[in-house]
Amino acid sequence: MLCLGLMSGTSADGVDAVLARFQGAPDRPEWQLLSHHHSPYPAALRDELVRIGQGEARPAAALLDLAEAVTEHQALAARGADPDQRASLIGCHGQTLWHRPPSSDKRGASWQLLLAPLLAQLLARPVVHDFRATDLALGGQGAPLVPRADAALIGPGDGWRGVLNLGGIANLTLIPPRWGPQKQESVLGWDCGPANSLIDLAMEQFSDGQQLFDRDGAMAAAGRCDDGMIQRWLREPYFQLSPPKSTGRECFGQEDLRRRLQELESVERADAVATLTGFTAAVVAQDLDRLRADRSIHLLELLVAGGGCRNPVLMSELQRRCRGLAVRASDQIGLAAEAREALVFALLAWWHHRGHPGNAPAITGATREACLGVRVAPA
């Protein structure tokens, strides 16, 4: 079956669209990535999404206009990846505006901006969307949804295999080995903390909006990392939580950056970016250290996807801090780093079509597994 996956993450840089073919057993399908297209958001649209994602209020009319603009851009990206309309089903994540994990006094909720009936009409094909809602209704975090899909797409290796996505947020998947005493362990996954979100915001601030990310890690490479401050930050509450846990720009956005820059006081801009880059790597390394200590899980390799894998300084920091671990881009095993998350939502749409569960209670904390998403057909 040909499916189209559409994904825009917390970085809000645009929409990734992939056309993929799936067949066979849902848990280990035969799959082929046929095309990938990235459609950047216009600057004004991206800026508005980032501001709202950090808590800025907007009138209802403005949110409606924004939903329409996001939906139309999803359709634009879809046409770029599938100009001949070969896909028979579309899986669309939408644009997260706010994610609220469950707490002791409030159920979890998550808002992905999308007018799904409009998208189905624009593309003249059924759309599966709202993938997080069912897991949240079952008491889960609603995130991350990628780990179960990672296990299906990548499969086990000779030892524990990690897949790290470095988008706005760093999220981690751990896939048990194909043999040995731990082969029956569950797939694990959680949101580690910020990946590119703070680095990107700092670059935009320092360049007066001229640079939206640290291209090739050039700014970080010119600076010096403050490891003392990083160790202090690692003691913050979120980084002490045990999985399941999830987060987003609502926690690691402009206000969080402002506080961290104040704590760094009068350091040079390059030093600040170097420290934020090292912080991203240190958050991941700390989680992996705890995993070894608490559960005797030792990764054999760490495959890195998302825009952050194109930052050589960040990759070098990961290699330095994750001692003894082979760190490499997911491209090296045939999984295109920038296409991975869109491919996941193509798979989730196919799973919905097959009636196959898409969440994993061990990862999200939901009371049970369930088929995810809501299907909308064109009129």
Curated annotation (Swiss-Prot):
Pathway in which this enzyme or protein is active: Amino-sugar metabolism; 1,6-anhydro-N-acetylmuramate degradation; Cell wall biogenesis; peptidoglycan recycling
UniProt enzyme class: transferase
Known catalytic reactions: 1,6-anhydro-N-acetyl-beta-muramate + ATP + H2O = N-acetyl-D-muramate 6-phosphate + ADP + H(+)
Keywords annotated in UniProt: ATP-binding, Carbohydrate metabolism, Kinase, Nucleotide-binding, Transferase
Leader sequence residues: none
One of the record's GO molecular function terms: kinase activity
Domain of life: Bacteria
Enzyme Commission code: 2.7.1.170
List of residues binding ATP: G9, T10, S11, A12, D13, G14, V15, D16
One of the GO biological process terms: peptidoglycan turnover
Keyword Nucleotide-binding in annotation: yes
Function noted in UniProt: Catalyzes the specific phosphorylation of 1,6-anhydro-N-acetylmuramic acid (anhMurNAc) with the simultaneous cleavage of the 1,6-anhydro ring, generating MurNAc-6-P. Is required for the utilization of anhMurNAc either imported from the medium or derived from its own cell wall murein, and thus plays a role in cell wall recycling.
Protein family membership: Belongs to the anhydro-N-acetylmuramic acid kinase family.
Protein name, UniProt field: Anhydro-N-acetylmuramic acid kinase
Source species: Parasynechococcus marenigrum (strain WH8102)
Gene: anmK
